[in-house]
Design a protein with these regions (language model features):
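Double-stranded beta-helix
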Residues: 142-170
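A short glycine-rich, His/Asp/Glu-containing loop-to-beta-strand
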Residues: 56-88
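Ligand-binding loop in jelly-roll beta-barrel domains
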Residues: 127-151
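Glycine- and acidic-residue-biased ligand/ion/polar-headgroup-sensing regions
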Residues: 85-88, 95-110
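Positively biased amphipathic helices and basic secretion/translocation or surface-docking motifs
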Residues: 1-55
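Short acidic-glycine-tyrosine-enriched beta hairpin
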Residues: 110-130
């Protein structure tokens, strides 16, 4: 799994059940940044190199105000680019494993705080949250998850069934 090494130490440091909040700059050492800038230039954008111009993505509409773009990974790991319109929410859920969310543009908030451009939220299977896009422009983020989402609340059984069926078509 790609999660075995990806920021795993940060999850082990959690004393209470709450997401870990980092800024992407916290994850990169100064010497690494300088070396990277020397090799590829200051305007290097790994997201653009991975998927191209974000404005040209063919988003898949999941429900009103929520779109995603899936990038293929092996095993049960998923990486998605998610775009939420202002005020759009994701139902209360957790994950059957780890989840990393990096905000690329705009912001979202949940029970644990507000996450803005450059912030990273790190969750484990004990975290339940209900993210809502709260910026006037909505929110664009990268979500990397280890396993399927588990929904809670009024429509949980329907949403979980949909997730189960969808897992056969990955």
């Amino acid at each position: 799994s790609i999660f075995d090494n990806f920021l795993a130490d940060n999850l082990n440091d959690l004393d209470e059940v709450a997401p870990k909040k980092l800024n992407y700059k916290d994850c990169i050492t100064e010497s690494y940044k300088e070396n990277l800038e020397y090799k590829i230039g200051k305007n290097y954008n790994p997201l653009t190199n991975l998927i191209g111009n974000i404005d040209n993505i063919e988003w898949k509409s999941i429900y009103k105000g929520f779109r995603e773009f899936n990038l293929p990974l092996k095993d049960n790991d998923t990486i998605k680019l998610i775009k939420m319109d202002p005020g759009t929410s994701v139902p209360l859920h957790s994950h059957n494993g780890k989840e990393y969310i990096l905000v690329i543009d705009g912001s979202f908030s949940d029970e644990y705080g507000e996450y803005k451009k450059g912030d990273m939220q790190i969750n484990d299977q004990n975290i339940k949250h209900h993210p809502t896009a709260c910026n006037k422009n909505g929110c664009v983020c990268i979500s990397i998850t280890e396993n399927d989402v588990i929904f809670f609340g009024k429509f949980a059984s329907i949403l979980n069934l949909f997730t189960f069926i969808k897992s056969f078509f990955k």
